[in-house]
Amino acid sequence: MTISRFHVSRIFAILAGTAVLASSAVAATLTISTNASSNGNGLGGGSYTISGSGLDTSAYAPISLVGGAGTFESFCLEYTEYFSPGSTYNYTVANAAVAGAGGAVGGQDPVSLGTAWLYSQFANGTLSGFDYGAGRKTSNNFLQLAFWFFEDETPSISGYGPGYGFGDGNAFLDAAVTFFGSEAAAKADANGAYGVQVLNLTDKNGNNKQSQLYVSVPDAGSTMALLGLAMAGLAGVQRLSRRRR
């Protein structure tokens, strides 16, 4: 029996699907808390401290942390979604916020390039103009406003200022628009660019809670492991084929 390309493709698809199902069988949880630098703008914005997630936090520079090793600082994406500080929630990782409030289309609001570009630098400890020290709360204020701007939360907090528009005194927002060339370009979907993703939170009853930002490092290990599993499975099929000849 010969193995056609069609059968090889099916084998790879089945193995990949099995790996995905196995990884999603156990619900992941995290705890999200406020800290002394939260709510810098009086509108309930970040940063917030996320702990117990089990996520790889190696992309976060120590200077960006408030809660210490194993935690990371995040910001909210949807102005009209909420969470209870100190609570533990289930989460999934995606490139878009579920529901998404102001910028959602079809119940999904992809992270924008402007948001991804800024947050990745914040996490890396390299965001120009961000005060990681005593002035952190003020910096958080303007960074959170920039995220809400790029995620099209404007209808929710229209008229808020200063700092909620290009040329309105928000250095982070202005830098992102300048880097990408226009507001429209900075609001384009990131699709995982800069390693930035969304943590979509739900409570024990499945109710949506405030979606949060997360940045990861490229994981070559998982890709190679899946490829190895696929190749091992293919080798097994080939051996079985030879026995049946």
Model-derived segments and spans:
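Sec/Tat signal peptide C-region and signal peptidase I cleavage site
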Residues: 23-27
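Short, charged juxtamembrane terminal tails flanking transmembrane helices
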Residues: 241-245
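Serine/threonine-rich, low-complexity intrinsically disordered segments
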Residues: 4-5, 20, 225
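A short, hydrophobic C-terminal helix/tail in secreted or cell-surface proteins
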Residues: 219-238
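Short, surface-exposed polybasic-aromatic patches that bind anionic ligands, especially phosphate groups
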Residues: 28-215
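Bacterial N-terminal signal peptides that target proteins for export
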Residues: 2-12
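Bacterial N-terminal signal peptides
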Residues: 13-22
